[in-house]
Amino acid sequence: MEPVVMEIDHYIVHYGTVSDREAPNREYVRIDCFYRGAKVGQILLGNSVNPGNYASVSNGEIHLYFPLEQFANIHAVLQGASSGGIALYLESDPNGEPSIGGVRRER
């Protein structure tokens, strides 16, 4: 299948903590990704993130999930989003299930 690719020209980083009785004070990062003012996806990182899958398409947006330790690497790729060439991508297996997803930078 052809990969789903969403170009990014702007992003917002949210850093926070999730507190509940079972696992207090778990950190997370959410990066909302936009293209021409419309949200095209999000990247969630952290030990509070427990998705059923690590990449998906939801309501026309690419959603990616990573361990918090990957934040510096992902943020480094996102630097320069306003100058173009940055995109979220998602590849699926022959059954249409997400298999690979990430952030790419073209130069």
Predicted feature residues:
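Short linear motifs at secondary-structure transitions and domain/linker junctions
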Residues: M1-D9, G60-L64, R107
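Acidic, aromatic-enriched beta-alpha/helix-loop junctions
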Residues: A38-H75
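Generic structural motif
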Residues: F34-A38, S48, E91-D93, E106
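Residue-level marker of intrinsically disordered, low-complexity segments enriched
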Residues: M6, G16, V29, G41, ...
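Intrinsically disordered, low-complexity, compositionally biased regions/tails
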Residues: D20, G41, L45, N50, ...
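OB-fold ssDNA-binding interfaces and closely related basic DNA-contact patches used
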Residues: M1-L45
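Short, compact, well-ordered microdomains
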Residues: Y65-R107
